[in-house]
């Protein structure tokens, strides 16, 4: 029996079949599995504007393999376009809408299985979260990464180059013509932005989790190789959907994305220096999978796993196409396996192979791009969780992106919003030796936990990247580099110490010892708490008010929880 029989079998389902016939179904179709094709086509996003054509390829392959496809769409937000204005308030909340929409369509219509087509930003984790709720066999196949851009002299560039170029222009380091050259060359094609930013980090981690096919994270969009990957994914979901019930059970989403899959995802994240946003999203995914996983587990993995692949923004000359040419994610995992427990190789994957079977023949083809385990970029992973009185519940730093010292002590310069911070940086308020504090930008305080790419890019572009640190209860773009610490929990809106800081306070961070603290006495903190009144930003948006009321803090993945 198929799940879809609930809407298509029996005399009492004649009205249901009548409606389905109106969409073009014939008698013979009611004996076939119904496959949801969860697309995220939107013309605004470079990684998504071509996904309508991708869906046609996939649907044709599904029909050719004896199943019935039903395409539906989720929404999408382009973080790059939403950056630097109040549009960014909607980015993280869109993850919840996407998850809800997947759950709604799949469960309302009792579809048997799903193939999901995400690519960028919050769309990937949102679709994964929704798929975990539905818990039917699901294959993920992303649109694919964008090719790197190049300046006229051949220097590789990407979107992060342009954001930092704005800071360089503000500082008088480059001309308007050079900035225009960056603008016109950074994004040369469709696809998810070409570095190891959030989109490509998540698309890569799906390979580690076993829910996508090999090559998902690195094969370029709009290439024949990518088209073949779409077809393979479509064929695979049909094989599963047409199999016996016991076989289908093996490939339910939660049977693939289990605790070991979550641990493998974080291990690969550490090895490849993924975006700090992966912490937020993987914590949320773990909650949907009912996997017990927390920030302390991340540090344990980080201490164990070496960083062996460095990609833009951490290494600006290397992009996803280079990782693909050097052997792809499978070669990274194969190299990690040489040290034993870095990767859990017995876990199942959606292709029916164990992870070991998937990676056993993979090899690094260019050790200048993907290093060996004996010659890592760093002996520890590319992300770390810091603790201290400023982050009692944790804060996240992308250690792979640090350009200066790994320990820093400086004086606080405090801003109650990202806009205030940008104005302060541009006006010269931020000096070498400062710690820029941007607060009331957390999940509740923002609300929506804005990305701080504009202030971090200005800091880098103005030559302060290794001279200042930045801490925030907001988050960062995957394109951020430097001593940037986000996800500070508890956030200012919850009464966290970040909200009590004052200009001139001494702040100390030590990445290697996982410390983030303000040099304040217990008495000073208690006195400030007595006087503290959190800033509550006025909101016209009904959706953002709902979000603020339900969202948890970053240490919980910023998921929504109702009473």
UniProtKB/Swiss-Prot annotation:
Single Gene Ontology BP annotation: L-valine biosynthetic process
Binding positions ([2Fe-2S] cluster): 120, 193
Residues annotated as binding Mg(2+): 79, 121-122, 451
Keywords tagged on the record: 2Fe-2S, Amino-acid biosynthesis, Branched-chain amino acid biosynthesis, Iron, Iron-sulfur, Lyase, Magnesium, Metal-binding
Active site (catalytic residues): 477
Any one GO molecular-function label of the UniProt entry: dihydroxy-acid dehydratase activity
Enzyme class label: lyase
Keyword Thylakoid: no
Catalytic reactions of this protein: (2R)-2,3-dihydroxy-3-methylbutanoate = 3-methyl-2-oxobutanoate + H2O; (2R,3R)-2,3-dihydroxy-3-methylpentanoate = (S)-3-methyl-2-oxopentanoate + H2O
Family under the similarity heading: Belongs to the IlvD/Edd family.
Name listed for the protein in its UniProt record: Dihydroxy-acid dehydratase
Organism: Sulfurovum sp. (strain NBC37-1)
Taxonomy of the source species: Bacteria, Pseudomonadati, Campylobacterota, Epsilonproteobacteria, Campylobacterales
């Amino acid at each position: 029996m198929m799940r879809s029989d609930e809407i298509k079998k029996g005399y009492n389902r004649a009205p249901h079949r009548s409606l389905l016939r109106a969409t073009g179904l014939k008698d013979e179709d009611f004996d076939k599995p119904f496959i949801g094709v969860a697309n995220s086509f939107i013309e605004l996003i470079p990684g998504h504007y071509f996904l309508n054509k991708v869906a046609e390829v996939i649907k044709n392959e599904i029909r050719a393999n004896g199943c019935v496809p039903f395409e539906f769409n989720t929404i999408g937000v382009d973080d790059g376009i939403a950056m630097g204005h109040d549009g960014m308030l909607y980015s993280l909340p869109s993850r919840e809408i996407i998850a809800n929409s997947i759950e709604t369509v799949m469960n309302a219509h009792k579809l048997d299985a799903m193939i999901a087509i995400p690519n960028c930003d919050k769309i990937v984790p949102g679709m994964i979260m929704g798929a975990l709720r539905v818990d039917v066999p699901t294959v993920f196949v992303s649109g694919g990464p964008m090719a790197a851009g190049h300046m006229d002299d051949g220097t590789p560039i990407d979107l992060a180059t342009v954001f930092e170029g704005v800071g360089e222009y503000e500082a008088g380091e480059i001309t308007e013509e050079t900035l225009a050259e960056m603008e016109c060359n950074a994004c040369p094609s469709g696809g998810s932005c070409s570095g190891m930013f959030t989109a490509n980090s998540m698309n890569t981690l799906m390979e580690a989790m076993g829910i996508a096919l090999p090559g998902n994270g690195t094969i370029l969009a709009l290439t024949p190789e990518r088209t073949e990957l779409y077809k393979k994914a479509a064929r695979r979901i049909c094989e599963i959907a047409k199999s016996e019930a016991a076989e289908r059970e093996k490939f339910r989403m939660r049977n693939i994305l289990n605790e070991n899959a979550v641990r493998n995802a974080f291990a690969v994240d550490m090895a490849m220096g993924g975006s700090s946003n992966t912490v937020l999203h993987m914590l949320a995914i773990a909650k949907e999978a009912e996997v017990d996983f927390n920030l302390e587990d991340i540090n344990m993995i980080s201490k164990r796993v070496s960083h062996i692949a460095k990609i833009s923004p951490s290494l600006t000359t290397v992009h996803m196409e280079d990782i693909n040419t050097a052997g792809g994610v499978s070669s990274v995992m194969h190299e990690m396996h040489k040290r034993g427990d870095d990767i859990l190789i017995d876990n199942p994957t959606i292709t029916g192979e164990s992870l070991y079977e998937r990676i056993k023949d993979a090899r690094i083809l260019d050790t200048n791009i993907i290093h060996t385990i004996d010659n890592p970029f760093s002996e520890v992973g590319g992300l770390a969780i810091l603790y201290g009185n400023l982050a009692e519940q944790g804060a996240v730093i992308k250690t792979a992106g640090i350009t200066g010292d790994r320990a820093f002590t400086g004086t606080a310069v405090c801003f109650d919003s990202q806009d205030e911070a940008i104005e302060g940086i541009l006006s010269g308020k931020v000096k070498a030796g400062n710690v820029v504090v941007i607060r009331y930008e957390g999940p509740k305080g923002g609300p929506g936990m804005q990305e701080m790419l504009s202030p971090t890019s200005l800091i880098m572009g103005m030559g302060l990247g290794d001279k200042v640190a930045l801490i925030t209860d907001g988050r960062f773009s995957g394109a951020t580099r430097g001593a940037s610490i986000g996800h500070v929990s508890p956030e200012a809106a919850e009464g966290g110490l970040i909200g009590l800081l004052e200009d001139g306070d001494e702040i100390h961070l030590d990445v290697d010892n996982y410390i983030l603290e303000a040099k304040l006495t217990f008495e000073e903190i208690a006195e400030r708490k007595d006087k503290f009144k959190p800033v509550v930003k006025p909101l016209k948006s009904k959706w953002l008010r709902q979000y603020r009321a339900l969202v948890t803090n970053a240490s919980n993945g910023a998921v929504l929880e109702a009473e």
